């Protein structure tokens, strides 16, 4: 199990794009491509920044069930995680993850009311490599 978590962590730390999934008001899945925050420390908590007004933030408040998918395309490796997503809006958490270039998305800066952080806490996952997959707990 430790080996699989090491492989998954490697994919996590090197992935450029992440796909996050939420459930809409009719319980149909919605997928969105997002960039991760620059600080990636652990698979146990994965953070993204987004607009407070975004459809996904609204959906996560209603139903926190979520999934996250990321991959290393060239190596043929992918990871699907399922768990819970929280919408965080405290100034402390916003300050922690703020980057200078974020004004491109949040023009009012770190105090922009339309800037929030999504915190994903995975429960389990599936690691894909070539034509095989392995289920694991996080």
Residue ranges and their predicted role:
Residues 15-17, 44-46, 63-66, 113-115, ...:
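Short, surface-exposed beta-edge/turn micro-motifs
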């Amino acid at each position: 199990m430790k080996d699989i978590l090491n492989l998954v962590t490697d994919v996590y730390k090197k992935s450029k794009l992440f796909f996050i999934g939420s459930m809409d008001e009719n319980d149909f899945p919605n997928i969105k491509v997002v960039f991760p925050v620059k600080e990636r420390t652990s698979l146990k908590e994965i953070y993204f920044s987004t607009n407070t007004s975004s459809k996904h933030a609204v959906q996560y408040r209603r139903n926190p069930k979520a999934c996250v998918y990321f991959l290393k395309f060239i190596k043929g490796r992918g990871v699907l995680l399922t768990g819970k997503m929280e919408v965080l809006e405290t100034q402390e958490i916003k300050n922690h993850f703020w980057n200078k270039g974020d004004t491109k998305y949040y023009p009012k800066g770190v105090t922009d009311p339309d800037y929030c952080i999504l915190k994903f806490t995975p429960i389990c996952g599936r690691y894909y490599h070539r034509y095989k997959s392995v289920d694991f707990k996080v």
